[in-house]
Amino acid sequence: TELSSGGRSTDTTILSMSLIRRLRNDLDLQPKARKLLSFTDNRQDASLQAGHFNDFVEIALLRSALYRAVKANEQTGISHDVLTMKVFQSLDLPVEYYASDPEVRFAQKAETDRALREVLGYRIYRDLKRGWRITSPNLEQSGLLRIEYASLEELCTAEDVWQNTHEVLTSASPETRIRIAKVLLDYMRRE
């Protein structure tokens, strides 16, 4: 990004991430010296920047896990009913990163994993809403993810389904129906 294309919080986050990456790779520095220290003139600005930075990292982790899941299933695609499981598996977080009790086992471990999958599902679909992040387009907006609808083509080519609908749909070609249905479904999903 160019420094003028985002807001101050976005630019500060991107510069901070870049500096942290460079510091981690600088083997001339001792590990405890590889830190970034930032100053601000008030608590409100500090809180805003910390929240922005945390959100940026969370979204980057979520999107990278979604991208890896999609790439791993490129040939078959991923249906919505297993999407969160695939993203959860791609995320591959150690249990201590998301469980209040890192020693959790058995049914409690399964329940803890399920809770994280539900949060991931919510966050995935919320992130896919268009226009929600102005300076950070989602994977679909970036062309890295394509959403398709099960049986849409079969539905739109089945003439008997369209017999008692509006005359415009009855007389439309299957290709036109597919385009119309996809636009409508995309709009409903994004809004």
Q: Where does each model-flagged region fall?
A:
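Charged, low-complexity interaction segments
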Residues: 1-191
